[in-house]
Amino acid sequence: MVQRITNVTARQHMQRKRAPRITNVTARQYVQQKESFQGNNLFGEWRYGRYVVTSYGDHFPLFIWENGTWYENIEKITMTTSKHRTQTHPHEDTLPMTCKDMVVIMNHGIVGVAVGMAV
Protein backbone atom coordinates (compact mmCIF):
# COMPACT_ATOMS: atom_id res chain seq x y z
CA MET A 1 0.00 0.00 0.00
CA VAL A 2 2.80 2.44 0.81
CA GLN A 3 4.43 1.77 -2.58
CA ARG A 4 1.16 2.50 -4.42
CA ILE A 5 0.77 5.84 -2.63
CA THR A 6 4.37 6.73 -3.51
CA ASN A 7 3.83 5.84 -7.18
CA VAL A 8 0.59 7.81 -7.34
CA THR A 9 2.27 10.80 -5.74
CA ALA A 10 5.18 10.60 -8.20
CA ARG A 11 2.77 10.26 -11.14
CA GLN A 12 0.71 13.23 -9.99
CA HIS A 13 3.88 15.28 -9.58
CA MET A 14 4.88 14.48 -13.18
CA GLN A 15 1.40 15.35 -14.47
CA ARG A 16 1.51 18.67 -12.65
CA LYS A 17 4.91 19.40 -14.16
CA ARG A 18 3.40 18.94 -17.66
CA ALA A 19 0.25 20.95 -16.93
CA PRO A 20 0.36 24.53 -18.18
CA ARG A 21 1.14 27.16 -15.57
CA ILE A 22 -1.69 29.71 -15.53
CA THR A 23 -2.99 32.60 -13.47
CA ASN A 24 -5.81 31.73 -11.10
CA VAL A 25 -8.02 34.33 -12.79
CA THR A 26 -8.03 32.23 -15.98
CA ALA A 27 -8.57 28.88 -14.21
CA ARG A 28 -12.33 28.69 -14.81
CA GLN A 29 -11.93 28.22 -18.56
CA TYR A 30 -9.64 25.23 -17.89
CA VAL A 31 -12.15 23.79 -15.42
CA GLN A 32 -15.04 24.23 -17.85
CA GLN A 33 -13.03 22.40 -20.54
CA LYS A 34 -11.77 19.88 -17.95
CA GLU A 35 -8.15 20.54 -18.91
CA SER A 36 -5.14 20.11 -16.64
CA PHE A 37 -3.58 23.25 -15.20
CA GLN A 38 -1.37 24.50 -12.42
CA GLY A 39 -2.18 27.86 -10.86
CA ASN A 40 -0.95 29.50 -7.70
CA ASN A 41 -1.70 26.74 -5.12
CA LEU A 42 -4.56 25.67 -7.39
CA PHE A 43 -4.57 22.55 -9.57
CA GLY A 44 -6.84 20.85 -12.10
CA GLU A 45 -6.09 17.34 -13.35
CA TRP A 46 -7.55 14.00 -14.38
CA ARG A 47 -7.35 11.14 -11.88
CA TYR A 48 -8.85 7.71 -12.35
CA GLY A 49 -11.38 9.01 -14.89
CA ARG A 50 -12.40 11.95 -12.71
CA TYR A 51 -11.50 15.61 -13.21
CA VAL A 52 -10.34 17.07 -9.88
CA VAL A 53 -9.72 20.69 -8.86
CA THR A 54 -7.74 21.10 -5.63
CA SER A 55 -6.69 24.05 -3.51
CA TYR A 56 -3.37 23.70 -1.67
CA GLY A 57 -3.16 19.97 -2.39
CA ASP A 58 -5.17 16.77 -2.11
CA HIS A 59 -6.49 17.46 1.39
CA PHE A 60 -8.93 20.06 0.00
CA PRO A 61 -10.58 19.17 -3.32
CA LEU A 62 -12.85 22.02 -4.47
CA PHE A 63 -14.65 20.42 -7.41
CA ILE A 64 -14.79 16.94 -8.89
CA TRP A 65 -16.43 15.94 -12.16
CA GLU A 66 -17.39 12.29 -12.52
CA ASN A 67 -19.74 10.72 -15.08
CA GLY A 68 -21.37 14.02 -16.04
CA THR A 69 -21.89 15.29 -12.48
CA TRP A 70 -20.03 18.07 -10.68
CA TYR A 71 -19.46 17.71 -6.92
CA GLU A 72 -18.58 20.77 -4.83
CA ASN A 73 -16.83 20.97 -1.48
CA ILE A 74 -19.10 23.14 0.70
CA GLU A 75 -16.68 23.51 3.61
CA LYS A 76 -14.78 26.73 4.09
CA ILE A 77 -11.23 26.78 5.45
CA THR A 78 -9.64 30.10 4.52
CA MET A 79 -10.35 33.23 2.53
CA THR A 80 -7.92 31.98 -0.11
CA THR A 81 -9.70 28.65 -0.64
CA SER A 82 -13.00 30.53 -0.88
CA LYS A 83 -11.41 32.72 -3.55
CA HIS A 84 -10.13 29.61 -5.34
CA ARG A 85 -13.68 28.22 -5.31
CA THR A 86 -15.01 31.42 -6.87
CA GLN A 87 -12.26 31.43 -9.51
CA THR A 88 -12.82 27.81 -10.53
CA HIS A 89 -16.57 27.25 -10.20
CA PRO A 90 -17.64 25.56 -13.45
CA HIS A 91 -20.89 27.60 -13.63
CA GLU A 92 -22.91 24.40 -13.84
CA ASP A 93 -25.12 22.76 -11.23
CA THR A 94 -23.10 21.04 -8.50
CA LEU A 95 -23.94 18.58 -5.74
CA PRO A 96 -22.76 19.82 -2.32
CA MET A 97 -20.45 17.48 -0.39
CA THR A 98 -18.34 17.59 2.76
CA CYS A 99 -14.57 17.74 2.43
CA LYS A 100 -14.32 14.17 3.75
CA ASP A 101 -16.72 12.90 1.08
CA MET A 102 -14.86 14.87 -1.60
CA VAL A 103 -11.61 13.11 -0.69
CA VAL A 104 -13.41 9.75 -0.93
CA ILE A 105 -14.83 10.70 -4.35
CA MET A 106 -11.40 11.86 -5.49
CA ASN A 107 -9.86 8.48 -4.58
CA HIS A 108 -12.72 6.01 -5.11
CA GLY A 109 -15.53 7.76 -6.97
CA ILE A 110 -19.06 8.48 -5.78
CA VAL A 111 -19.52 4.76 -5.19
CA GLY A 112 -17.00 5.12 -2.34
CA VAL A 113 -19.35 7.54 -0.59
CA ALA A 114 -22.32 5.25 -1.24
CA VAL A 115 -20.65 2.29 0.45
CA GLY A 116 -19.24 4.37 3.30
CA MET A 117 -15.52 4.17 2.55
CA ALA A 118 -13.33 6.08 4.98
CA VAL A 119 -10.74 8.65 3.98
Outline where the language-model segments fall.
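Terminal leader/tail segments of proteins
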Residues: 1-119
